[in-house]
């Protein structure tokens, strides 16, 4: 939200319109979280200003690049296998050889991408409606105010993706969206906090 105030801003609007008792739900969630900490052998990570996908993105990279987590199979040492259980397409950018993603909705593994840079460029142009990130042709408040977004036609976006040349009039919005979507752009202080929480959790 420091970068884009409307980021996931629809959540509050949706909660306000919902009949769910959110205070009670949050109380139950906190109770379950504490029970996981107290009684189960799972690491529970909670860091201010962090979304779940930030935690997954940072820790996937950290564990993959840290030899302390490597596994030994005879004489062969390899990276710790990681399985991400989520249907969120943002995790497809975590295209490490040791990482797989299982979609609960599709009941199967999500196909790997062959070009992460191309994936991120297209996502930055198209935006991510579920996260309140509008496409680069639409107003910043399109999603939070439920305004119709301008259409992005394949004939318009194909040359940009093919030549990877971003028109000047959308560069600023592409850059903003990329910062919101790309795990490599998570601020260092947040990444460090996630790793510290991971190392300190039992």
Give, region by region, the residue ranges found by the protein language model:
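Extended two-metal-dependent nuclease catalytic cores across DNA- and RNA-processing enzymes
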Residues: 12-201
């Amino acid at each position: 939200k420091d970068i884009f105030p409307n980021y996931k801003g629809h959540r509050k609007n949706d909660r306000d319109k919902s009949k769910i008792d959110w205070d009670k739900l949050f109380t139950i969630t906190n109770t379950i979280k504490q029970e996981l900490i107290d009684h189960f052998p799972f690491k529970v990570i909670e860091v201010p200003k962090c979304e779940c996908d930030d935690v997954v993105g940072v820790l996937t990279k950290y564990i993959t690049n840290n030899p302390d987590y490597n596994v030994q199979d005879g004489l062969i040492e390899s990276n710790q296998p990681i399985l991400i259980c989520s249907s969120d397409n943002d995790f497809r950018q975590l295209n490490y050889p040791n990482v797989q993603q299982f979609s609960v909705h599709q009941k199967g593994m999500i196909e790997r991408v062959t070009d992460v840079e191309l994936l991120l460029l297209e996502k930055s142009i198209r935006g991510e409606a579920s996260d309140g990130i509008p496409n680069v042709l639409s107003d910043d408040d399109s999603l939070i105010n439920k305004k119709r977004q301008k259409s992005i036609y394949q004939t318009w976006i194909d040359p940009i993706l093919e030549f990877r040349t971003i028109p000047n009039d959308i560069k600023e919005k592409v850059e903003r969206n990329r910062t919101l979507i790309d795990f490599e752009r998570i601020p260092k202080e947040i990444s460090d906090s996630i790793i510290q929480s991971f190392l300190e959790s039992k």
